Curated annotation (Swiss-Prot):
PROSITE patterns: BCOV_S1_CTD, BCOV_S1_NTD, COV_S2_HR1, COV_S2_HR2. It is a single-pass type I membrane protein. This is Spike glycoprotein. Residues 1-13 form the signal peptide. Keywords: Coiled coil, Disulfide bond, Fusion of virus membrane with host endosomal membrane, Fusion of virus membrane with host membrane, Glycoprotein, Host cell membrane, Host membrane, Host-virus interaction, Lipoprotein, Membrane, Palmitate, Signal, Transmembrane, Transmembrane helix, Viral attachment to host cell, Viral envelope protein, Viral penetration into host cytoplasm, Virion, Virulence, Virus entry into host cell. It comes from Rat coronavirus (strain 681). The lineage of its organism: Viruses, Riboviria, Orthornavirae, Pisuviricota, Pisoniviricetes. Disulfide bonds join C21-C158, C153-C187, C165-C246, C284-C294, C329-C354, C372-C425, C384-C603, C930-C941. Residues 1250-1290 are annotated as: Heptad repeat 2. SUPFAM superfamilies: Coronavirus S2 glycoprotein, SARS receptor-binding domain-like. The record marks R756, S757, R905, S906 as: Cleavage. Fusion peptide 1 (FP1) and fusion peptide 2 (FP2) function cooperatively and have a membrane-ordering effect on lipid headgroups and shallow hydrophobic regions of target bilayers. They are considered as two domains of an extended, bipartite FP. The membrane-ordering activity is calcium-dependent and also dependent on correct folding, which is maintained by an internal disulfide bond in FP2.
Length: 1360
């Protein structure tokens, strides 16, 4: 059992293996050989590589945990080296100097059984750190005589260790000098641990998280247990294993083995037994089988098809680009310069288009710490930036705490402000005192204008640091000197004086008489640091980011001179000084501001790689000038890159394009495929069959998608690439445990796997669970048979809906609401404490809730919803989602009968066009429907009204121009152009006809108006008569009531005559306490009302919140998609919805189809085939159609055959019935005690004194009403109305009979002739001719013609 020694070894003992730090140089002829890679892979199935997090255990549990674990199946590297005389001095460089990143897992060989004579360590020592100098912490785990010495100290690790194999030791007999620190280093942990010295292998788990280092240990190949942890506060970036002793010369001595594999943050599935021991573990991302186990949280998943979500194509290569041959930034030279400024005059330098090595920079300046803001410090290594701006200054020892982020001490308030919002790193380092001098300088221009001198004021040593304790700003006209003529007469308090520079004003001084002496009272006395004189023009100021202190304070009494204003050296105040030295080193602060992260050509070369070729068409990782990610490159021809531009971004800030400065080619960058993998897993199979949906196998293997290294077989199907299954789609099965969809099934057979050596046992077959004939031949209903109505026909319906999503904000002045301007009430309201504040706080929360809801609604609308309208054809504008053509009306050629144009114009057109109203007797509307807005159809749309052709009498400008042009042309060139005047003439005649028929209708209307108005006058007369009668009755009743009231008051005065006297006595006895009680009652009442109002506001806001959530839901489900819910988006089955902003809410227009007719069918919840297999419908019903079972959808009756596409196969035909619980609301009312008993309980022996009330009848003024004057006025008004009777004149009308056209008379004559000829022949042929001729003889003698004419009857006008 591992335990900790309480005693520590002496700190001077720093033994690591057999190494000593002696200045003897080994050779650099050859590099150290590369670490060997193990043939053994990491197998985590038994818990290897895992750890008990802080020794926590779980009993009989299987759960998912996320931590730092190795990748299952990864390789080990042996990081151990054998120390020899010829060991290369490059042994501590990569690859043996390795990245620590998240952590490492180590498997270490215990060499105790074959330990060389004299050796005290059983395995090599591991060192984990960043720069391995005494300015940062280093973790060392050193074995020594059966213990492990763990330490975390600020070591300076020896980089050139020397072994005992070297014969020349230089006379140095000291053993154990493995670091070069001359004095004991600063440590945060030094502890000793025992370990099982008899174990063959030792296992270590090292990782870092949030600045804390964790170490775990085990002596068996299972989960490790907690060893120690310590907060370091910095990122450990590298590690190496010290070479182990000389090459053994004794036979049987083993070589050291230190097998290491990296850790990454991964999710593992653990199984804990009844003792809390990890018995098995699964790396969830290592294989598809592992992912299935983690998905089901079971070590033995059930047989089934699992969709593996979050699947992404794995990159197959790396595209790396850096600008080569850039100069070195030489940042370390500037940081280590022999002069450094003070905080008062901090310096900045910007580095751009150059490279730097951060690791060597930190070693060069012997960095104490490096911490970053808004970026992980470990990520700065190897990144690129647009530029790096660095500020630096020496740190006064007493003010070091001021530089912590978030502090507001003197340094950050008045000297240098750190921008916590910027991406920056804070570097603390030190230089030897002999190599640096502090430059103290005051950059203030207005201080220097009045005589400030750095040497005279600061007179500091080489390592003294000046800093400001306060900063002051002044105006352009400021001058600290008093005016000589003003202070000349002063005897006491007389300051120095001098003339001020041009454009400035002297210090303000007032001369005051004090006895026989005059006294000067001047501004800013005694010091601007302590004065509160508002006349003092030196104003304190705080620093902004990037600002220097504007100036130190000035003791104005010490400013003067014989001519020009000048201040003495000791006149400047508000600064202090301290040394920067500690341990003979000057400590310096530097702020590195990283501009343009992952873009630009200012790069760290710590992990720089050689440039690679750009591979197109496959998924690759990329690192383009520090911008990292993965994607697919496609070469394109692009001319939109500027000369300074290499990367192209989209509107979301994602990398979209890349210009290669090496080849000058341009590329388009697309993301790697992220899709869906279905895994068909069988419990008896070692691995699943895989279906990469919608992907060809070539793409799968070219992009290294599959995590299976060597699949046995694969092929393309119409569902995608199938891996680890045989293609047997020509076979069909009627039972399937692994259904892939679309009628395909993966069938697993152990026998099939055994028969074929290259088979996994999986086959992709066709799944046919049943046929239509089987269903109808051997089927019975499951769960009963029911009648149901299913729609067969629909109609489209529109439904408008308003949903309130916000309300006006309310704020209340509580004091004004309760008390108004009454002072006593306001004073007493203070006793109610924070009631008013609580009211306003609640209303503030309500208003904030309104803002939050409005933001949520706006977010839902912004994402994919357009509120602008669809404009009608002929109007320019963007075509969007909502049609507002009913609002705009009908414009252009699309207008036809029945459209909006025929029904009227819209409100918008009323504004855009002049409007002319016509009297329409029935033909104007028909004319508009015919033209449809096309004026050229004017004569083609002539209307007929009672046999007369008519047109509307109003012409547009274009029609007038056209007809005028035609008439002019007909007059200019007769007779050839005479036809051009015909349209004009017809138009005029038809419009005159239209005016004539309109006048007749107007005449009839006049008659109706006159009759109606005369009837109204008569009704008004009757009304006034009734009013006059009613007023007379009112007068009599009021007077009678007044007389009765007078009698009543006379009677009451005898009984209540003492009322006024009693009230006066009561008022005189009210004291302040009683008055306050009355005020208190009023305040309570009003506060109760206010509280009720606020409660109602909260209640209403709850309803609005619910409706706003419903509005968001309807935007997402109705507007952005088609809702499957019935009657949710309108009434019926949803088609589409439109949304528009409305006052305090949203206005929805839903379109849906509503059933208009139904059919009644027999429906069964399920069917049973052959008594053993059940069928259930998918999104529909099983119905009987002409004796056969069919499937139909639930929304529309359309019977079709039952197949596996519309049904679900069940293992049995059993039906489970569940009885619904009978739960009723409690409607009983609690019995209350008798009201009188409860009243008597609280009010006993209560008496009231009846006051003596008297009443003075003389003070009551009883008035009798006399309404005769008002009634006379009404009677006069009736008389005037009678005299204003209107006698309307009737407009005359004309009746016009139109002569029939000549061709009508011609047809009548021809018909008569034909009749006569027919009669003649009939008479001749029948023997009746003699009779006919006799009778017609006389007719022939009197034959004559008659002409019909036009008769016009004139009805003269007359008066009624």
């Amino acid at each position: 059992m591992l335990f900790v020694f309480l005693t520590l070894l002496p700190s001077c003992l720093g033994y690591i293996g057999d190494f000593r730090c002696i200045n003897l140089v080994n050779t650099r002829i050859s590099n150290a050989r590369a670490p060997s890679v193990s043939t053994e892979v990491v197998d985590v199935s038994k818990g290897l590589g895992t750890y008990y997090v802080l020794d926590r255990v779980y009993l009989n549990a299987t759960l998912l945990l996320t931590g730092y674990y190795p990748v299952d199946g990864s390789m080990y590297r042996n990081m151990a080296l054998m120390g020899t005389n010829t060991l290369s001095l490059n042994w501590f460089e990569p690859p043996f100097l390795s990245e620590f990143n998240d952590g490492i897992y180590a498997k270490v060989k215990n060499l105790k059984a074959s330990l060389p004579i004299g050796s005290a360590s059983y395995f090599p020592t591991i060192i984990i750190g960043s720069n391995f100098v005494n300015t940062s912490y280093t973790v060392v785990l050193e074995p020594y005589n059966g213990i492990i010495m763990a330490s975390i100290c600020q070591y300076t690790i020896c980089q050139l260790p020397h072994t005992d194999c070297k014969p020349n030791t230089g006379g140095n007999t000291l053993i154990g000098f493995w670091h070069t620190d001359l004095r004991p280093p600063v440590c945060i942990l030094k502890r000793n641990f025992t370990f099982n010295v008899n174990a063959e292998w030792l296992y270590f788990h090292f990782y870092q998280q949030g600045g804390t280092f964790y170490a775990y240990y085990a002596d068996v190949s299972s989960a490790t247990t907690f060893l120690f942890s310590s907060y370091i506060g910095a990122v450990l970036t590298q590690y190496f294993v010290l070479p182990y002793m000389c090459s053994p010369t004794t036979s049987g001595v083993s070589s050291p083995q230190y097998w290491v594999t990296p850790l990454v943050k991964r999710q593992y599935l653990f199984n804990f037994n009844q003792k809390g021991i990890i018995t098995s573990a699964v790396d969830c991302a290592s294989s598809y089988t592992s992912e299935i186990k983690c998905k089901t949280q079971s070590m033995n998943p059930n047989t089934g098809v699992y969709d593996l979500s979050g699947y992404t194509v794995q990159p197959v290569g790396l595209v790396y680009r850096r600008v080569r041959n850039l100069p070195d930034c030489k940042i370390e030279e500037w940081l280590a310069a022999n002069t450094v400024p003070s905080p008062l005059n901090w310096e900045r330098k910007t580095f751009q288009n150059c490279n730097f090595n951060l690791s060597s920079l930190l070693r060069f300046v012997q960095a104490e710490s490096l911490s970053c803001s808004n970026i992980d410090a470990s990520k700065v290594y190897g990144m690129c930036f647009g530029s790096i701006s660095i500020d630096k200054f020496a740190i006064p020892n007493s003010r070091r705490v001021d530089l912590q982020l978030g502090k507001s001490g003197l340094l950050q308030s008045f000297n240098y402000k750190i921008d916590t919002r910027a991406t920056s790193c804070q570097l603390y380092y030190s230089l030897a005192q002999d190599n640096v001098t502090v430059i103290n300088h005051n950059p203030s221009s207005w201080n220097r204008r009045y005589g400030f001198n750095d040497v005279a004021t600061f007179h500091s040593g080489e390592h003294d640091v000046a800093y400001a304790e306060a900063c002051f700003t002044v105006g352009a006209s400021y001058c600290p000197c008093a005016k000589p003529s003003t202070v000349y007469s002063c005897v006491t308090g007389k300051p120095k004086s001098a003339n001020c520079p041009t454009g400035t004003s002297n210090r303000e001084c007032n001369v005051q008489a004090s006895g026989f002496k005059s006294k000067c009272d001047c501004t800013c006395n005694p010091s601007p640091l302590t004065t509160y004189d508002p006349r003092c023009l030196q104003a304190r100021s705080m620093l902004g980011v990037g600002d220097h202190c504007e100036g130190l304070g000035i003791l104005e009494d010490k400013c003067g001179g014989s001519n020009i204003c000048n201040c003495s050296a000791d006149a400047f105040v508000g600064w202090a000084m301290d040394s920067c030295l500690s341990n003979a080193r000057c400590h310096i602060f530097s702020n590195l501001m990283l501009n343009g992260i992952n873009s630009g050509t200012t790069c760290s070369t710590d992990f720089q790689l050689p440039n690679t070729e750009v591979v197109t068409g496959v998924c690759v990782k990329y690192d383009l000038y520090g911008s990292t990610g993965q994607g697919v490159f496609k070469e394109v021809k692009a001319d939109y890159y500027n000369s300074w531009q290499n990367l192209l971004y989209d509107v979301n800030g994602n990398l979209n394009g890349f210009r290669d400065i090496v080849t000058n080619k341009t590329y388009l960058l697309r993301s790697c495929y992220s899709g869906r993998v279905s895994a068909a897993y069988h419990q008896d199979a070692p691995e699943p069959a895989l279906l990469y949906r919608n992907l060809k196998c070539d793409y799968v293997f070219n992009n290294n998608i599959s995590r299976e290294e060597t699949p046995l077989n694969y092929f393309d199907s119409y569902l995608g690439c199938v891996i680890n299954a045989d293609n047997s789609t020509e076979q069909s099965v009627d039972a399937c445990d692994l259904r892939m969809g679309s009628g395909l099934c993966v069938n697993y057979s152990i026998a099939h796997r055994a028969r074929r050596s290259v088979s996994t046992g999986y086959k992709l077959t066709t799944f046919e669970p049943f046929t239509v004939s089987i269903v109808n031949d051997s089927v019975e209903s499951v769960g009963g048979l029911y009648e149901m109505q299913i729609p067969t026909n629909f109609t489209i319906a529109s439904h408008q809906e308003f949903i309130q999503t916000r309300s006006p904000k309310v704020t209340i002045d509580c004091a004004a609401f309760v008390c108004g301007d009454y002072t006593a009430c306001r004073q007493q309201l203070v006793d109610y404490g924070s009631f008013c504040d609580n009211i306003n706080a609640i209303l503030g929360e309500v208003n904030n809730l309104i803002d939050t809801m409005q933001l949520q609604v706006a977010s839902a609308l912004i994402q994919g919803v357009t509120l602008s309208s669809r404009l009608a054809d002929g109007i320019s504008g963007q075509i969007d989602d909502i049609n507002f053509s009913p609002l705009l009306g009908c414009l252009g050629s699309d207008c036809s009968e029945g459209t909006k144009a025929a029904q009227g114009r819209s409100a918008i057109e009323d504004v855009l066009f002049d409007k002319v109203k016509l009297s329409d007797v029935g033909f104007v509307e028909s004319y508009n429907n015919c033209t449809g807005g096309q004026e050229v159809r004017d004569l083609l749309c002539v209307q007929s009204f009672n046999g007369i052709k008519v047109l509307p009498p109003v012409l547009s400008e274009s029609q007038i121009s056209g007809y005028t042009a035609g008439a002019t042309a007909s007059a200019m060139f007769p007779p050839w152009s005479a036809a051009a005047g015909v349209p004009f003439a017809l138009s005029v005649q038809y419009r005159i006809n239209g005016l004539g028929v309109t006048m007749n209708v107007l005449s009839e209307n006049q008659k109706m108006i006159a009759s109606s108005f005369n009837n109204a006058i008569g009704a008004i007369q009757e009304g006034f008569d009734a009013t006059n009668s009613a007023l007379a009755k009112i007068q009599s009743v009021v007077n009678a009531n007044a007389e009765a009231l007078n009698n009543l008051l006379n009677q009451l005065s005898n009984r209540f005559g003492a009322i006024s006297a009693s009230l006066q006595e009561i008022l005189s006895r009210l004291d302040a306490l009683e008055a306050q009680a009355q005020i208190d009652r009023l305040i309570n009442g009003r506060l109760t009302a206010l509280n009720a109002y606020v409660s109602k506001q909260l209640s209403d806001m709850t309803l609005i919140k619910v409706s706003a959530a419903q509005a968001i839901e309807k935007v997402n489900e109705c507007v952005k998609s088609q809702s499957p819910r019935i009657n949710f988006c309108g009434n019926g089955n949803h088609i589409l919805s439109l949304v528009q902003n409305a006052p305090y809410g949203l206005y929805f227009i839903h379109f849906s189809y509503v059933p208009t007719s139904f059919t009644t069918v027999n429906v069964s919840p399920g069917l049973c085939i052959s008594g053993d297999r059940g069928l259930a419908p998918k999104a529909g019903y099983f119905v009987q159609d002409h004796g056969e079972w069919k499937f139909t959808g639930s929304n529309y009756y359309y019977p079709e055959s039952i197949t596996d596409k519309n049904s679900v196969v069940m293992s049995s035909c059993a039906v489970n019935y569940t009885k619904a619980p009978e739960v009723f609301l409690n409607t009983s009312i609690t019995n209350l005690p008798d009201f009188k008993e409860e009243l008597d309980k609280w009010f006993k022996n209560q008496t009231s004194i009846v006051p003596d009330l008297s009443f003075d009848i003389g003070k009551l003024n009883v008035t009798f009403l006399d309404l005769s004057y008002e009634m006379n006025r009404i009677q006069d008004a009736i008389k005037n109305l009678n005299e204003s009777y209107i006698n309307l004149k009737e407009i005359g009308t004309y009746e016009m009979y139109v002569k029939w056209p000549w061709y009508v008379w011609l047809l009548i004559g021809l018909a008569g002739v034909a009749v006569c000829v027919l009669l003649f022949f009939i008479c001749c042929c029948t023997g009746c001719g003699s009779c006919c001729f006799k009778k017609c003889g006389n007719c022939c003698d009197e034959y004559g013609g008659r002409q019909a004419g036009i008769v016009i009857h004139n009805i003269s006008s007359h008066e009624d």
